[in-house]
């Protein structure tokens, strides 16, 4: 009888017959344990996603507290984006080595300590340091890309849908946390709110983190970790017939391009409505409408990607996002903008999760944590770049027309990369395979 280790090196190892482990592994994939883990990932992702949104809400209060100008007060947000980007890559690599449990525990602890430290900051530098290092780089970063990579190990038939559900946690965080933070700030001030959030997050997230203690099923049989069904014209060592780093760079560049385009409505819709004379409140309603339909789109696109693969899902989403951006150029009426905003949310929600699906389809599974994190980090950087770039274009032209056209140009670049990769791809979409005992 052949034996294999469980692969868990944190809480002890034990040997069991490989055939039994193989059977248990197949029972876990797409099974009850997988769906429970997905639910836990959605919940902890929603909680941990606060690190990306809270700094925006407290920015005016921080500016007033420390007596700095708006540019200096915006520094913590910029450092948050940089910290998140750097942290995602390192946390992804750590996840590939030891699994997601330890990164998630580290994230829960860092978020709690980070918010307490931010609430006790004596100056803007200390606040920015706590925000960038503890809250973003160590705290929130393992709760998006690395968490999605972990979820991908637990699903085969429903992998695309599962990845979309996991990614939705970031949307839920953006919907739920800002009004909660604002409510407590009104009554208790920003410092007490930050400290309270830190204590709350540690108390709630640490027990949740232990739901990820169990290693992913495929990690239990070492021979199966990287096993995939190969076709004669598909070589995972050369995705799309390119070097792995070149293929990764193209996917990352596509992520930047799509999100520069995506950022135009998401970041500037409120200001756009104000400039058109509709008021800030109408713009905020359109943003909420956009995010709500984005959740629907994200889930639906996950189901679609299970049927046609991540690349084709990206192609469809990119094309439809371009259509919605063009509609923004054509229509400027209030009712029309409500409709276009709903369509934009419905069209673009599935683009970001498709990158995680593409990575799992075309790269070795053992690299999932790192490569998924790089791809998703690129989308975050694209949002940051687009938000700034479209603002610069508005300042230059005194109109958002050129900014929308700029978004269309970046969207065309994303669409071109998707078409190029589809043309390079050969054979059926790969799927994770098991190794017979």
Annotate each language-model stretch with its function.
Residues 102-116, 312-327:
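Structural signature of the two symmetry-related core transmembrane helices
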Residues 141-155, 350-363:
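Intracellular juxtamembrane helix-capping segments at the cytosolic ends
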Residues 166, 170-217:
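Helix-loop-helix hairpin linking two adjacent transmembrane segments in secondary transporters
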Residues 36-70, 88-91, 177-178, 264-270:
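Extracytoplasmic
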Residues 55-59, 244-303:
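Extracytoplasmic gate region of multi-pass secondary transporters
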Residues 86-125, 305:
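Conserved MFS/SLC helix-loop-helix module at the cytosolic interface between two early adjacent transmembrane helices
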Residues 46, 114, 126-142, 256, ...:
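Hydrophobic core of transmembrane alpha-helices in multi-pass small-molecule transporters
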Residues 62-63, 94-95, 179-188, 273-274, ...:
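Interfacial helix-cap and linker-helix signal at transmembrane-aqueous boundaries
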